[in-house]
A protein has these predicted regions:
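Asparagine/serine/threonine-enriched low-complexity, disordered tracts
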Residues: 55, 80, 118, 136-139
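Amphipathic alpha-helical coiled-coil segments
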Residues: 120-159, 166
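Short amphipathic alpha-helical segments that mediate assembly, nucleic-acid/protein binding
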Residues: 24-31, 43-48, 54, 96, ...
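Extended alpha-helical coiled-coil "stalk/arm" regions
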Residues: 64-128, 159
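Leu/Val/Ala/Ile-rich N-terminal alpha-helices, chiefly Sec-type signal peptides and the beginnings
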Residues: 1-42, 48
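Short, charge-rich amphipathic alpha-helices with coiled-coil/heptad character
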Residues: 35, 39-73
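Short acidic DE-rich linear segments
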Residues: 171-174
Length: 174
């Protein structure tokens, strides 16, 4: 919402959402002083209506943020469980690789038995590729989910701060 304030020497346009998003009560007091001494004192009423509208929407917006926060929290927990399972699978396969290497290294190199054991080591290492790729994807997904959760929590907290600030502004207006 924009306020068009006219006074003796000219006029000014105030983008109310951006102006109030700074949350500086001193700036609001100055703006109210300018509005009250201007040719358009009805801007104060427009400002009051805008703030009341924002305050009325507070509960609905908070509920929406809360729903998203709960959903993202559950998704993060599930993703962390999946990562733990994948890491466990990788550790089991790595144990198999170690055992196969130990058995292979107990024989002379380039003998028939050594070659058979070496084939086993290669099989285990091949089996490691898929879980490692999966783990990489899961970590990326977890990072994205945590980022989305953080953004919603930030919006939730910002909304609470806005409500407190709007209460102060309403006290200044009345």
């Amino acid at each position: 919402m924009d306020l068009e304030i006219r006074y003796e020497n000219g006029s000014m346009t105030v983008h109310l959402e951006e102006f109030l998003s700074e949350r500086r009560i001193a700036k609001v007091r100055k703006l109210l002083k300018v509005i009250r001494s201007s040719f358009t004192p009805e801007c104060e009423q427009q400002m009051k209506e805008f703030i009341q509208e924002q305050t009325e929407q507070f509960e609905q917006v908070q509920k929406e943020h809360n729903i998203y926060i709960e959903g993202y929290t559950q998704k993060v927990k599930y993703a962390e469980q999946q990562i733990m399972q994948t890491k466990h699978r990788i550790s089991q396969i790595q144990t198999g690789v170690k055992n196969a290497r130990f058995l292979r290294d107990s024989h002379r190199k380039n003998t028939k038995v050594w070659k058979n054991r070496n084939a086993d080591v290669k099989k285990y290492r091949e089996r490691l590729k898929e879980p490692r790729a999966t783990l990489k994807e899961q970590n990326e997904e977890l990072r994205n989910l945590k980022n989305l959760l953080w953004q919603r929590q930030k919006a939730f907290d910002g909304n609470v701060r806005n409500k407190e600030f709007y209460k102060k502004v309403m006290q200044e207006i009345t």
